[in-house]
Structure formats: C-alpha cells, structure tokens
C-alpha cells in the first residue's frame, strides 16, 4: 500500500531533525525548470500569482533566488520533518522510530507543487508553491499541466517496487487532482473523516486534516498492507462506519473531539 498526503504551508527549518538519515529528491530537474521561471518574477508579481501578502511574496522571491539543487543538511531538511500543519500534527513524525522512518520511506509520498513527489526523507529547501497555482509554463497554463502524467507514472513505479496496486488517498482535492487517474495503475481508496456538529456528521477541515495524518501514522506504525485493516482505525474517537462507506471510500465518524 502506498499513501499520498498534501504538503503544508507552515514549515519548520529551525528545529534539529530527529533522524540523521536523508535522501535526495528524485525529480529535481523538473523543480529547477520551475525555479528558473519563478526567478523571472518580481516579489510583487509573486504576491499576485500566489494571492499572498507582500511580505510572503518577498520571502518566497528570496527563497527562489537562493534555491540550489545541491541539497545538504546545512541548507535543507527532510520533507516529513520540515512540513508542519494539521496533517503533520496528526502524523507526529518527530516521535517515529528508525523502523517507522524506513517503512514510511517506502509507503508514504508527499505531493508538491515544486517537487512533484517527495519521499519522507527527501531533503528539501523551504518554498511555497501551491499545486493550484496558475503559473503558465512551457507545458501548459498551470502546474497541473506542468506535471502532466509524471506524478502518476512515479506513483506507478513506487507501487511496482513494492509489488502492490493500492493507493490510499489522504491528500486534499487540490493536490490529488495532480494525480491523473487514467495514467495510474492502481486501486484508489479514499477516506472521509466526519465529526458530529449540530446533530449531523460533517467534514470539519481542521479535524479532517489532522485525521489524515493520524491515519498515515496508523498505517506506518501497524505496517498495514491489507486495505481491509484500515477499517480498524480508531484513533482519538474515530470509528469506521459501514453504512456510509463504499468499498473504495471509507468513512469514519466521531461524536466528540478530544478536549
């Protein structure tokens, strides 16, 4: 089983990594192509492109300017430890064992607007480039066109390497839209995490994102390779609901969020 999750806007490049292990991203030639194009934009143009403040636009213009594919532990950090945010709070990779990192490296991938697809221990430099960014490029009108079927092809390779064909989608719609299903040789399993609010079970963004991270951790810690065992997920009050679920869309309900 291979899992995919979204990246995060919030980054942590200050704290010391809990593991010295690292790998290099596999698709940096594509990243370099995007960086060269982004370097042609002024901070104001970057702010407009990304719909962010002048401060964030200026920060990312500087990041693009200093970006180099020569990643070291001095200028980069492992992706799984660099990303922070709701999904990564649920994942809590800072408490992984060495064996957990090994399993995650084989079974977890992070989708990325700049890097395409990252393994947990892949080094990355800080950046912000949402997959939904409408950046015209040589391959089309936006990043979905830029990545084309490449991400699907790379996922196929990762699945083939582990002799499996199950892809567990724990990413947002914005990011999973970069996975072209027609090019993917896999059974896709989707998940929904709903919380009880005003008498109805609803997807509440903050809780759902955190739950995707908790599900990722559950799979890694339990070394799950049988999709049927995903139904055993019962972290922080969530329970599988057969009535609302379908074979490839697993729904988990929770009545009370932890205090």
UniProtKB/Swiss-Prot annotation:
Signal peptide annotation: none
Pfam annotation, one family: H2O2_YaaD
Domain of life, source organism: Bacteria
GO terms classed as biological process: response to hydroperoxide
Entry GO terms, CC: cytosol
Family: Belongs to the UPF0246 family.
NCBIfam families xrefs: PRK02101.1-1 (NF002541), PRK02101.1-3 (NF002542)
Protein name: UPF0246 protein PFLU_0992
Organism: Pseudomonas fluorescens (strain SBW25)
